[in-house]
């Protein structure tokens, strides 16, 4: 079972790798929050930096945003990567999409973006609280599935 499913119930970030691929303006608040929570933030500035990392390590959290390493007319290449992941891999990560145009916690927007949570960029001060709440709900949903899969297949 992935490390994302182990650890303390109240702190999903403790000893977990968090890949941060957001607009430069938003990097600092995320890095600061995850360091304070005991996580291991890994911020990247260009999409080309991410794919070599993903060959050797699968971060437990992906924090992505519109406008990352693009001119605005293109979609985020990392979001495309997550959307095309095999489902057994996708279930092992928690993806957050940051946008100025989407309301924080909008489930339909999260579903349409294939992420676990959407955050509005104006509400980044509450990001830790929002991510913890959403992660807890997500873990409650998938934990039964993963426990059953482990019992049936042994992996």
Predicted features by range, described:
Residues 1-33, 133-155:
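Non-catalytic signal-transmission and effector/linker regions of two-component phosphorelay proteins
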Residues 20-25, 45, 64-68, 98-100:
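Structural motif
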Residues 37, 57, 112-115:
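Short, structured coil segments at secondary-structure junctions
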Residues 45-61:
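Acidic, metal-coordinating helix/loop segments flanking the phosphotransfer/catalytic sites
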Residues 60-86:
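Conserved phosphotransfer microenvironments
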Residues 89-102:
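A short, hydrophobic beta-strand element within the central beta-sheet of small alpha/beta folds
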Residues 99-117:
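Alpha4 helix (beta4-alpha4-beta5 surface) of REC/receiver domains from two-component response regulators
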Residues 123-131:
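C-terminal output helix
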């Amino acid at each position: 079972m992935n490390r994302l499913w182990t650890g303390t119930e109240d702190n999903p970030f403790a000893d977990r790798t968090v890949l941060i691929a957001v607009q430069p303006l938003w990097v600092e608040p995320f890095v600061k929050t995850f360091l304070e929570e005991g996580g291991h933030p890994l911020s990247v500035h260009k999409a080309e930096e991410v794919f070599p990392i993903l060959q050797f390590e699968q971060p437990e959290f992906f924090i992505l945003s519109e406008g990352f390493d693009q001119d605005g007319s293109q979609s985020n290449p990392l979001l495309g990567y997550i959307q095309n992941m095999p489902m057994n891999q996708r279930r092992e990560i928690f993806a957050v999409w940051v946008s100025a145009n989407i309301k924080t916690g909008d489930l339909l927007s999260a579903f349409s973006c294939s992420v676990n949570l959407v955050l509005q960029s104006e509400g980044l001060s509450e990001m830790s609280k929002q991510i913890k709440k959403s992660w807890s709900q997500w873990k409650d949903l998938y934990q039964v599935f993963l426990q059953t899969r482990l019992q049936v297949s042994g992996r």
